[in-house]
């Protein structure tokens, strides 16, 4: 169900000409680390109004109190450019969903997980992705300079077992 909603959001983005991407837990699952998620997070680099209008036209309901869209009971959150520390660079298509590259996803998760102790799930996601893809220290070259050290520490800890 959630993956179907992510696909619908991707279609709406393409049709509206929005260069957005599904991020968060859905992106983690698409990149191979199996875990549960209850919502669809969408990075929106453009002013959000165009995507918001397109989502409404596509049958997504907007709850002003929660500041989220939903369809079939699945919440859809728009993540604006000023809410991320480093906007993702590369968009890719996985299972019919427009998402971010593995490097961008790991970078985003490291930034939120390292800076907010209440976001431990983000670091758990990075660990899961490192294990699934058998990433090594040299993968850090694909990340922002300010998170490379944290990534290498996680790889080292995983390799020590």
Give the positions of each predicted feature:
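Compositionally biased terminal segments of proteins
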Residues: 1-161
């Amino acid at each position: 169900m959630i993956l179907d909603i992510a696909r619908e959001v991707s279609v709406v983005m393409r049709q509206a000409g929005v260069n957005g991407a599904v991020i968060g837990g859905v992106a983690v699952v698409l990149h191979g680390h199996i875990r549960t998620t209850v919502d669809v997070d969408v990075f929106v680099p453009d002013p959000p109004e165009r995507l918001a209008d397109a989502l409404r036209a596509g049958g997504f309901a907007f709850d002003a109190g929660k500041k989220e869209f939903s369809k079939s009971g699945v919440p859809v959150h728009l993540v604006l450019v000023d809410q991320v520390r480093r906007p993702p660079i590369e968009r890719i298509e996985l299972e019919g969903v427009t998402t971010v590259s593995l490097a961008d996803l790991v970078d985003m998760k490291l930034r939120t997980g390292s800076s907010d102790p209440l976001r431990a799930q983000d670091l758990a996601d990075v660990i899961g992705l490192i294990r699934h893809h058998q990433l090594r220290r040299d993968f850090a070259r694909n990340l922002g300079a300010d998170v490379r050290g944290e990534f290498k520490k996680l790889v080292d800890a995983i390799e020590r077992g």
